[in-house]
Design a protein with these regions (language model features):
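Active-site beta-loop-alpha junctions of metal-dependent nucleic acid enzymes
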Residues: 32-33, 83-107
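Helix-centered, glycine/charged polyanion-binding patches within enzymatic domains
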Residues: 118-175
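Hydrophobic "anchor" residues on beta-strands that sit immediately upstream
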Residues: 52, 70, 113
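Short, positively charged, Gly/Tyr-enriched micro-motifs
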Residues: 1-53, 57-63, 77
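Short glycine-rich phosphate-binding loop at a beta-alpha junction
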Residues: 111-118
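Short glycine-rich loop/turn motifs
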Residues: 65-71
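Short helix-terminating capping/connector loops at secondary-structure junctions
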Residues: 20, 47-48, 107-110, 133-140
């Protein structure tokens, strides 16, 4: 259970509450091992796919190297249905994240919406899906640009963008 505690504070809490003596490094090792074990189950789980997906990419630094994390979320359930970690912001990682999000679908739902920021990789990836899979996967990206509601599209879709931006901030804060 994530309580927002550092590894050292988690170690101290286990000692205080349950009289379990374990080092912070051992907790980190257990977390890494658990992540490797559950990844296949998380990746293959048949998440419910709604008719509104929202996407965003953000960067994190791993040992001083900038790495990009692409996330695609089902807006209704707030489940992360697609993700990709890459060393660049190109179209390739965006396509891989979309491919993961669309896994299990034979066609897109009627009234499907894909909401993202103004980054050009999203429309290019959408064009690639339409080219490769035809009408069943032809969709347009609704781009919510900037931080203010300067047009009707931004006003209508801002909550979706804020949802994924909040996820990114939470992810970056806990990393």
């Amino acid at each position: 259970v994530k309580l927002g505690l550092s590894l050292r504070k988690t170690s101290q809490a286990l000692k205080d509450l349950y009289n379990i003596s374990i080092s912070h490094q051992q907790i980190a090792n257990y977390c890494k091992t658990a992540a490797v074990c559950i990844k296949p189950f998380v990746d293959q789980y048949p998440y419910e796919k709604g008719d509104v997906f929202t996407a965003d990419e953000t960067y994190i630094k791993i040992r001083g190297i900038k790495t990009y994390v692409w996330l695609i979320m089902n807006a209704a359930t707030r489940s992360i249905i697609g993700y990709q970690v890459s060393d660049n912001r190109g179209v390739g990682p965006c396509i891989l994240a979309m491919r993961m999000a669309f896994r299990g679908l034979t066609r897109l739902p009627e009234n499907f919406k894909f909401i993202a920021d103004g980054y050009s990789a999203y429309p290019l990836a959408a064009m690639e899906f339409a080219k490769k899979f035809g009408k069943a996967f032809a969709f347009r990206i609704t781009q919510v640009i900037g931080l203010t509601n300067d047009d009707a599209v931004s006003t209508e879709h801002r909550p979706f963008k804020q949802m994924i931006e909040r996820l990114n901030r939470t992810y970056k804060a806990s990393y």
